Swiss-Prot record:
GO terms for molecular function: S-adenosylmethionine-dependent methyltransferase activity; tRNA methyltransferase activity. This is Putative pseudouridine methyltransferase. PANTHER family: TRNA (PSEUDOURIDINE(54)-N(1))-METHYLTRANSFERASE. It comes from Vibrio cholerae serotype O1 (strain ATCC 39315 / El Tor Inaba N16961). One of its GO terms (biological process) is tRNA methylation.
Length: 201
């Protein structure tokens, strides 16, 4: 199972604001782009992939929207608008939820009022954790561990205090090259590299 976490620190948990910020300063379109590149291939979808989108611009609690490739159906298309519509559906379903609650929106689509740190703590129990960092070891020079989970951010960098907690959880820093890339581009390159490793190329 491959997992991805996108920590979207500027992404609003209000569905209308999410829509308003497509192409705006919060760049909420990145959420759809990461979903598209993590879950789908040409004319198909990947198996055994999960993406967690953590939206943190909120008046109450962060929202973690989880999409499971093996379970999701009725997506409505592979385009940005269809994927944004799924996020809107999840956010609308989360209205009124208390802290650390879970709501199944539809098969393969879940929303939780859980923080990035709490989510990471859960995943650390059964996943090999990797954080994208330009100064990390090249992904081509390491052996990817079982059940890898790759941690990405939007245009707002990861805060230093999170770096300390990730270090305690054993998160490894890895690099995809010398250039800073969009999170969605990182997802594609990660998939490609693991595809090569698994195929023995």
């Amino acid at each position: 199972m491959r997992s991805f976490i996108l920590r979207a620190r500027s992404a609003p948990t209000d569905s209308q604001r999410l829509l308003d910020e497509i192409g705006g300063k919060c760049h909420t379109e990145i959420l759809a782009h990461c979903m598209m590149n993590s879950l789908f291939t040409a004319q198909s979808h990947r198996e055994d992939v999960v993406i967690h989108l953590v939206l943190e611009s909120t008046r109450d609690y962060s929202r973690t929207i989880t999409v499971e490739a093996n379970e999701i159906s009725d997506v409505g298309g592979f385009h940005e608008a269809a994927l944004i519509a799924l996020l809107v559906k999840a956010l609308d379903a989360s209205v009124g939820m208390g802290k650390e609650q879970t709501r199944v929106v539809q098969p393969g689509l879940t929303v939780r009022t859980i923080s990035f740190e709490a989510l990471l703590g859960e995943l650390a129990e059964h996943h090999s954790l990797y954080m994208m960092d330009k100064k990390g070891d090249s992904i081509r020079d390491i052996k990817i561990g079982p059940n890898p989970c790759f941690i990405l951010t939007d245009h707002i960098p990861m805060p230093k205090k999170s770096g300390n907690s990730m270090k305690r959880l054993g998160v490894e820093k890895i690099s995809l090259g010398p250039k800073m890339l969009f999170a969605s581009q990182c997802v594609t390159l990660i998939h490609n590299e693991i595809d090569h490793q698994e195929a023995g190329w």
